[in-house]
Amino acid sequence: MLLSDRDITAELDAGRVALDPYDPGMLQPASIDVRIDRFFRLFDNHKYPYIDPAEDQPELTRLIESKPGEPFILHPGEFVLGSTFELVTLPDDVAARLEGKSSLGRLGLLTHSTAGFIDPGFSGHVTLELSNVATLPIKLWPGMKIGQLCFFRLSSPAKKPYGSGEYASRYQGQRGPTASRSHLNFVHTDVTVTDAGQQGE
């Protein structure tokens, strides 16, 4: 069930859902706006010949911080990681989804590539996967509205919420834009087995 503004306010007032800092003026009819922080993670494409999700590639990205009062310039075709200014904490029976802002989408800014879902139990700054699909550079001002969080109540509390220890929970407590940790639970699956259970020729 998608939570309304009344439900979101009730969850925040009860301390079950937390946004830090919280600005009541960011509340929308069925979501709450979030802002972009001053940290960005850039890709150093010359460090590796390719990106391999099965390997640890610690030099693939580097962290930068925008200077006070200055925007970060996202060039056409560029992909960088950012993060929400707000720290988001969810209980074990509420999940969330990050959506972009319509006004920014109309300028060619994509807020996330695929990872818009936030598990129940998560706590941390939400990493943004920012892309510029326009033909001109886009200025990203730290503190500007960058997206909106929608909240969903689960049919029952999660048996093993994010961060419970049952899962890797690789991004629990993350601060700032966090690089991929896909190598930590990468699994090579044998796909030569056919649907009938026979080895492929």
Curated annotation (Swiss-Prot):
<comment type="similarity">
    <text>Belongs to the dCTP deaminase family.</text>
</comment>
<dbReference type="InterPro" id="IPR036157">
    <property type="entry name" value="dUTPase-like_sf"/>
</dbReference>
<comment type="pathway">
    <text>Pyrimidine metabolism; dUMP biosynthesis; dUMP from dCTP: step 1/1.</text>
</comment>
<comment type="function">
    <text>Bifunctional enzyme that catalyzes both the deamination of dCTP to dUTP and the hydrolysis of dUTP to dUMP without releasing the toxic dUTP intermediate.</text>
</comment>
<feature type="binding site">
    <location>
        <position position="162"/>
    </location>
    <ligand>
        <name>dCTP</name>
    </ligand>
</feature>
<dbReference type="GO" id="GO:0033973">
    <property type="term" value="F:dCTP deaminase (dUMP-forming) activity"/>
</dbReference>
<protein>
    <recommendedName>
        <fullName>dCTP deaminase, dUMP-forming</fullName>
        <ecNumber>3.5.4.30</ecNumber>
    </recommendedName>
</protein>
<dbReference type="GO" id="GO:0015949">
    <property type="term" value="P:nucleobase-containing small molecule interconversion"/>
</dbReference>
<feature type="binding site">
    <location>
        <begin position="127"/>
        <end position="129"/>
    </location>
    <ligand>
        <name>dCTP</name>
    </ligand>
</feature>
<dbReference type="GO" id="GO:0008829">
    <property type="term" value="F:dCTP deaminase activity"/>
</dbReference>
<keyword id="KW-0547">Nucleotide-binding</keyword>
<dbReference type="GO" id="GO:0006226">
    <property type="term" value="P:dUMP biosynthetic process"/>
</dbReference>
<feature type="site" description="Important for bifunctional activity">
    <location>
        <begin position="116"/>
        <end position="117"/>
    </location>
</feature>
<feature type="binding site">
    <location>
        <position position="119"/>
    </location>
    <ligand>
        <name>dCTP</name>
    </ligand>
</feature>
<feature type="binding site">
    <location>
        <begin position="101"/>
        <end position="106"/>
    </location>
    <ligand>
        <name>dCTP</name>
    </ligand>
</feature>
<keyword id="KW-0378">Hydrolase</keyword>
<keyword id="KW-0546">Nucleotide metabolism</keyword>
<dbReference type="Pfam" id="PF22769">
    <property type="entry name" value="DCD"/>
</dbReference>
<dbReference type="GO" id="GO:0006229">
    <property type="term" value="P:dUTP biosynthetic process"/>
</dbReference>
<feature type="binding site">
    <location>
        <position position="174"/>
    </location>
    <ligand>
        <name>dCTP</name>
    </ligand>
</feature>
<dbReference type="InterPro" id="IPR033704">
    <property type="entry name" value="dUTPase_trimeric"/>
</dbReference>
<comment type="subunit">
    <text>Homotrimer.</text>
</comment>
<feature type="active site" description="Proton donor/acceptor">
    <location>
        <position position="129"/>
    </location>
</feature>
<dbReference type="GO" id="GO:0000166">
    <property type="term" value="F:nucleotide binding"/>
</dbReference>
<dbReference type="InterPro" id="IPR011962">
    <property type="entry name" value="dCTP_deaminase"/>
</dbReference>
<feature type="binding site">
    <location>
        <position position="148"/>
    </location>
    <ligand>
        <name>dCTP</name>
    </ligand>
</feature>
